[in-house]
Amino acid sequence: MAEAVQENPTELRGEAKKEAFHQEAESKIENFAFVRPDVVIPDNEKIHVKLAGTDSCRASVQILNKGGDNNLHYHPNMDLIYMVLQGRIEFYGPGDKSLGVFGKYEGIKLPENSRYWFRSVGDEEAHLLQIAGYPRGAKASKRIPVEAAKRGPSLWIGMTEEELRIRRENNQHG
């Protein structure tokens, strides 16, 4: 009888640890929705709207006016998946080589260190879903320009002051 009592607390302790592990993760579950912010986006510009993030991934929507684009760059510690939600986006690689023109619900996967840039090529405002994955615990993604920036950094909506500070410290715009 003493042995059974001795084994039982060990099992309970293991089960309790497992349950605490799951409860901690589940306490971080968040719902989100994309709502276009009521802001005017200057011609040929774009903004980012943060949807959600963890310490190993982030999702945001970039909103681009017609002609809105960025410069050739890469991310040494981030894999990217993009999908067009509205409008048309053309992605380019080095030498302005077209990687494809994408419409609604089409997209592209860009592994870390892939050099790319993109531009809104449709007649309407474009909404581009960005899903970024990076090493667990990374403070921020890195953005390394290959060519000079065409403008200053994009406006980010929905980020905390700390997230914005870290982003400024870790990103180069050319």
Question: Residues of each region from the PLM?
Answer:
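A short hydrophobic beta-strand segment most commonly corresponding to one strand
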Residues: 81, 109, 123-142
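Short strand-connecting beta-turns/loops that link adjacent beta-strands
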Residues: 55-56, 77, 96, 123-124
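Short acidic-glycine-tyrosine-enriched beta hairpin
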Residues: 95-112
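Asparagine-centered strand-capping/turn motif at beta-strand->loop junctions
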Residues: 118-122
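Short, conserved beta-strand element in jelly-roll/cupin
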Residues: 62-65, 74-91, 131-134
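A short, N-terminal "cap"/entry segment at the start of jelly-roll beta-barrel domains
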Residues: 1-58, 71-72, 143-174
